Amino acid sequence: MTMTKQSSLSPGSRLYDYTTQDGAAWRVSALKEVSYDVVVQPRLLDPANPALADALSSGTTPARRLIVIDATVRSLYGEQLAAYLAGHDVEFHLCVIDAHESAKVMETVFEVVDAMDAFGVPRRHAPVLAMGGGVLTDIVGLAASLYRRATPYVRIPTTLIGMIDAGIGAKTGVNFREHKNRLGTYHPSSLTLIDPGFLATLDARHLRNGLAEILKVALVKDAELFDLLEGHGASLVEQRMQPGEGGTGGAALTVLRRAVQGMLEELQPNLWEHQLRRLVDFGHSFSPSVEMAALPELLHGEAVCIDMALSSVLAHHRGLLTEAELGRVLDVMRLLHLPVLHPVCTPDLMRAALADTVKHRDGWQHMPLPRGIGDAVFVNDVTQREIEAALLTLAERDRVPRWRALHGAVDMGV
């Protein structure tokens, strides 16, 4: 077969024609270049700060923007946002979404699409603004990817999990038939603006929810980040990762930056997930099924933490983690008041959870297990017997005497 290359308007894209036994044929080869920015920008709604206005600018014409905002975020920041936009001559319309896990369905995506259509969002130069947690940015991202076959959007994550995970990658998604993120696309926002000041109004549980995903990054690739969580975890929650006199400002900013950097280092070379062996899938082998089975009792990060605890015990049983290392891992989880077990975590559910993950990973477990703290290996041979033994170990260690001796009678969130 001889191929003849034709001209192309796009670098890296080619059209070839060739002949087969039955006649003419063509092959299309195209590359999609993607670049986007993730910017830490404190005091985002300060009228003197032009960053948001610049992101929404239309050049010489007055900006007109659709803003999809979480209902809670609107109650907290709606007036401040409106004053900022008015001060920068941005005409806007709010689409308010009560963005919780139960609303993470296609019906909510269609609500956003309806708002986009009614507003008259053009195809290229008027990005929709998504302002809220990871659930909201996932919903808006999916709507933007579908509307006119892809329109741009800008993310302002207001939760920690949005700032270090859901709001900085390429994936969008909603749940379908009790399956986590079963429907989705790859459609990164052109810009993500991270203002740690929003965390000041985040409740402690949702802050811990984000710290669970930071712990994920720490355990598989960043031992220094783990040390920071171990040393400052409680105060990070107490002070909502805010700077201040006697506060954890320096540690908080370092934790945030290392978490974002670590996540992006893993995502960038494999943005479209052509490679299904992903370090950032640590904590995500069992957790999608656990989270959906326990809904609405568990937040995403809490389900991930249960998965990480189970995976860490599996690693310990295989000699990848020492007893001391496993103790440190579980102690940090308890320090952050994150769960390590839940009543839905039966052997049958975990068997089904792993089976579904194997389908998602194209027939392989590709399960990341920690090897020491700050490193990981992939395994493909975890057995049901190992899972049941790990569940038993977790149940036995649920409230270890050493923790009570160190910290007294405290609610450990398990």
Swiss-Prot record:
Entry annotated with the keyword DNA damage: no
Annotated GO biological process: antibiotic biosynthetic process
Catalytic residues, chain numbering: 171
Cysteine-cysteine disulfides: none
Binding sites annotated in the UniProt record for NAD(+): 70, 101-104, 134-138, 158-159, 171, 180, 198-201
Keyword DNA repair listed: no
Name used for this protein in its record: 2-epi-5-epi-valiolone synthase
Organism of provenance: Streptomyces hygroscopicus subsp. jinggangensis (strain 5008)
Lineage: Bacteria, Bacillati, Actinomycetota, Actinomycetes, Kitasatosporales
